[in-house]
Amino acid sequence: MKLVEVKHPLVKHKLGLMRAADISTKNFRELATEVGSLLTYEATSDLETEKVIIDGWCGDVEIDRIKGKKVTVVPILRAGLGMMDGVLEHIPSARISVVGMYRNEETLEPVPYFQKLASDLEERLAIVVDPMLATGGSMIATIDLLKQKGCKQIKVLVLVAAPEGIKALEAAHPDIEVYTASIDSHLNEQGYIVPGLGDAGDKIFGTK
């Protein structure tokens, strides 16, 4: 599994702001979008381009254009919605495939409750977004579903990742790529990432 910890100064600065205990919903939400955008920039750096001739203001102009790549953004509900716009800033024509997962707080296992996916997943690069890669259970279940529907190329964007989740995801899906703003220390007894961001979903949506 390809794992990239994006160490750009802007990413580190913005993620650091998100770790503050007293951060407002507005600021957390905006920063989640901004970091998601920067991760997207990194994750799409290997997209293949081709030369195309277009009509320019002074005649024919040769330009580079992304070559035949269809993309679907896959936010894992609900917190993944907070990163979705960051991807769409760069790929506004991407289809949106939604997967609903929540974590059973007693067993820490993922529980699926909703899915609405692009009809042609076998032709698309899927960019899965979720702020936290903790135990890895929800991400593994989501990728299982995408592969069952025919998706062949999958990239994952997360704000923070725990070593435990990385290990589990690599064991289940060694063929994917993961881009994160930080590999944090560990999971606590409640399954939260330390130092992490707290409950990203609550902070994005202003709920408790």
From Swiss-Prot:
Segments passing through the bilayer: none
Pathway: Pyrimidine metabolism; UMP biosynthesis via salvage pathway; UMP from uracil: step 1/1
Keywords attached to this entry: Allosteric enzyme, Glycosyltransferase, GTP-binding, Magnesium, Nucleotide-binding, Transferase
EC number(s) reported in the record: 2.4.2.9
UniProt-annotated binding residues for 5-phospho-alpha-D-ribose 1-diphosphate: R78, R103, D130, P131, M132, L133, A134, T135, G136, G137, S138, D199
Binding residue positions for uracil: I193, G198, D199, A200
Note accompanying the cofactor annotation: Binds 1 Mg(2+) ion per subunit. The magnesium is bound as Mg-PRPP.
Cofactor(s) for this UniProt protein: Mg(2+)
Any one Gene Ontology BP term: UMP salvage
Record entry for activity regulation: Allosterically activated by GTP.
One function term, GO molecular function aspect: magnesium ion binding
Catalytic activity of the protein: UMP + diphosphate = 5-phospho-alpha-D-ribose 1-diphosphate + uracil
Family stated for the protein in its record: Belongs to the UPRTase family.
HAMAP family in the record: Upp_B
Function of the protein: Catalyzes the conversion of uracil and 5-phospho-alpha-D-ribose 1-diphosphate (PRPP) to UMP and diphosphate.
Name this protein carries in UniProt: Uracil phosphoribosyltransferase
Annotated source species: Actinobacillus succinogenes (strain ATCC 55618 / DSM 22257 / CCUG 43843 / 130Z)
Lineage: Bacteria, Pseudomonadati, Pseudomonadota, Gammaproteobacteria, Pasteurellales
